[in-house]
């Protein structure tokens, strides 16, 4: 027996002398290489640009053209980076366990088993809650920033959605530098609608002695749209013309939303924001107003309906045309002088038609493929 032990000892020493590496040394080298690879990957991401606004770190999101969009994109980017870091850690620990804590083929011994380690288990339980709390905090901070409203925006826009297009009206323009002011409320049309509604509401049910409510949210059946706004300068889309909403850069803009029929959704991908457009917003308890601090650059940005609303929902597009404040005031002057939207755009040197999308074909009988010829 002693001879056998001496033989094993001699063989082990001989293997070390000819360069066999201990298992612990191999594990250390693998750990160092893995750490180096992770470090290089993180370094590459950080030095790829001083800003996280690049195609790799946006992870599929648009860059955004408003301060609100930038904050949401940054939240998205850092959330993904945190998720990736946690994924690398979890998968790394998993593969480490699989590779280095398995039973060796030629060894009768099982790997060391680690269980019922209360401090370790409490740590693993607490870490996910900490991560969730941190993400929740930053989500609430960004959400509150996006939903903030000021009392006196520079431009107030009425947005009316209907199957399957849009109407935009300029309700009020008040540049704080005193450069331009405009009250676009069409009081005649709005007062007529409210007068009709008031007349109906004052009708008395002679049988019960109280006002007679209408069939639609208490309103008359032929006057369910009295909640809509009307403006003297409006742009209405048609099946042959995409509505172009002209807005100034560098100004606080408020959007007041309402639908004339079913539920729609106002969505400009470059705003990284969408909001449901409800009929009867007040009765439906919906917040139909949102603001953007500014549009940071000029350009044409496609807008879409993001709520399934019927046959041509997928083609219910519009365009936001961001121009300088000087061009915007000239555009409004052209519209107030009686020019159409296309004519006013051409007058300020802009394309008179949408450049980010195109009109749709409303012919329900059109076919995408030619019918086979008769033999």
Swiss-Prot record:
Pfam families: COX2 (PF00116). Its cofactor is Cu cation; heme. It comes from the Bacteria. GO terms for biological process: ATP synthesis coupled electron transport. It is an enzyme of class 7 (translocase). Binds a copper A center. Its EC number is 7.1.1.9. It catalyses: 4 Fe(II)-[cytochrome c] + O2 + 8 H(+)(in) = 4 Fe(III)-[cytochrome c] + 2 H2O + 4 H(+)(out). Gene3D superfamilies: 1.10.287.90, Cupredoxins - blue copper proteins. It is found in: Cell membrane. Subunits I and II form the functional core of the enzyme complex. Electrons originating in cytochrome c are transferred via heme a and Cu(A) to the binuclear center formed by heme a3 and Cu(B). This is Probable cytochrome c oxidase subunit 2. The gene is ctaC.
